Amino acid sequence: EITTRLVGSEMCIRDSSILSVKRIVEAVDEPVIVVVSALGGITDKLINTSRMAAAGDASYENEFREIVYRHVEMIKEVIPAGEAQVALQRQIGELLNELKDIFQGIYLIKDLSQKTSDTIVSYGERLSSIIVAQLTGAEWFDSRKFIKTEKKHSKHVLDTELTNSLVRETFSSLPKRVLVPGFISTDKMTGEVTNLGRGGSDYTAAIIAAALDADSLEIWTDVDGFMTADPRVISRAYTINELSYVEATELCNFGAKVVYPPTIYPVCHKNIPILVKNTFNPEGVGTVIKREVSDPQSKAIKGISSINDTSLILSL
């Protein structure tokens, strides 16, 4: 049996929670593939830094220094002083130097192509995944080698058949604990870095889970699962224990930003249950998403979500 765990949507992996991530990963006895996202806020900082550089704003260097600081301090916080920490700092430093050179190039030519932008944002997951791999003792695998996209109508979309084949080949002999950067992919023809879209780490985990017929997909984020309503609006909102794939998809499409909507299709097709849990409250029940729901407390209205000027009431 294989469990695929997405540890943290991008907003979840914060400096304060990374040791919680370690405990979550180490709690699994069976083989586990862990997919991680960038440290919280780093993807936005990467995008902002690149735009500042392209606009000729020299203060992009200050923004970049914050990115460097976050990762360097993270390593000092979670990896004990010694040879392992020094080696990791060197490895992360090399990636950060690559990134620095890219930003300097953008600043000099005052241009930011989509290709360069895709390369830049990939560093968020590459950096965080290497740190978490060291922290958890997991074997690091480069998702750029097996998550493949193709260009259709000027957009990069997943090549499912090729990706499934490469995932099965890559993990034909599965180590006890595997660490994979989410979100990142490459063009199957050119090898250029692409990505699966914001929230794509969820999708990466689902793709791998489906390709390997995993026993389950766990998504560890910063909420207790799907709620009956937005708790910031409805104070009495509570966690929904079970949802069907269809119900979860509808809620996600109408504003419930718990799971990236494309995540659900690959595992739905294979009838692999999704468990959504809170990194900061691992003892919480969370929400199970599966084909058939057997919630004895089912009510006429399961949950309410909304987007601007639009609302969805989900009835049974």
Q: Positions of the model-derived regions?
A:
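Nucleotide/pyrophosphate-binding catalytic subdomain
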Residues: 8-264
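Preference for bulky hydrophobic residues occupying beta-strand positions
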Residues: 182, 274, 313-315
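Conserved dinucleotide-binding and phosphotransfer motif residues
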Residues: 270
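Sterically constrained small-residue positions within well-ordered secondary structures
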Residues: 2, 189, 304-306
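Internal nucleotide-binding/catalytic subdomain
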Residues: 216-218, 273-276, 281
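Single conserved hydrophobic/aromatic residue that forms the stacking wall/gate
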Residues: 1-8
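A conserved regulatory-domain signal marking ACT and ACT-like small-molecule sensing domains
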Residues: 285-316
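Acidic-aromatic/histidine active-site loop/patch
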Residues: 267
